[in-house]
C-alpha cells in the first residue's frame, strides 16, 4: 500500500476498493491499468467509458481536447478517490512529464487551479489489455493523455493542451513567471534570423481560432513561411524550437512525435507562421505563432496568456473534437 497501514487496507477492502502498490519500474499505461483495477463499482460507473463513447456535450471522448474542461465530475483531490488512487494518478502524471519539468507544471497548476488535482478530473476509456485503452486527465489548461499506441497513427494518444495564466488573465509583454513563455522566445529567435523577404512571408495578419487544429492535409494552403525556404542555420534554429517544445514530455512521446512528423514529410513539409494580431506591448516579439504541416499542428497563443494546442499524427484523416 502507498499509505501503508494494515488497518487502512482493511477499510479500503471493506468499501470495495482494491489496494494499490506502485511497481518501482512502471509505465503510465501500466499504472493506468492498476488504477482501473483498483476502482470500486461506483467509481467505474463515474469515470470509465467504452472506447467509442460519445459524450453528450463533448462528442467522441478519446479525441476531445479543450482549454478548460472536465471529462468527468470527480476532482482528483476529492474523497471520491482513495489516498492510494490519488497517489497513483500523480504517478501517472509524473511518468508522462519529464522530471525536470515537474516543478514547472506544479507552478502552473498552483497558479491556475490551486495545485495538482484541484479541478482536475480523470477518465479511463476502453479496457486495459484490450489494445484499446486511454487515460485522460483534464482541467483548466490541461488535456493530457496516454494510450500505449491504442490510437493508430496519433502522437500523445490524441490531441493535447497545455497553458498557464500567472494571474489575472492579462499578462505583461514579457510574461513574467509563465513557465511556457520560453517556448515563444525560442520561436521568436527564428524570426529574428529571417531577412526582410522571409519575414514578410512568415508574418500573417489573420489569427485563426486557437482551437482550429484540425489537419489541412495537402488539400488546403497553410499560412507562413515554408521550412524549405529557411537557410541551414535558420532551419537548425527551428530544430531547436521543436526540441524545446518536446522537452517536457517522456521519451516515448517525443519519439512518437518525431516519427509521425518524419512519416508525413518532416519539418520540410511544415510552415512557420507568426501573427501580428495580439502583439502584447507592440514589441514585435510575437505572442502568437504556429508550426504546421499536413498532419502536425503546434499552435501557441500567447495573448492574453499562454494557451497551446497540439495535434500530431502521421495521417491527416483523423477525427478531432476541439
Residue ranges of predicted features:
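A cross-kingdom marker for long, charged
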Residues: 22-41, 45-322
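N-terminal export signals
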Residues: 1-19
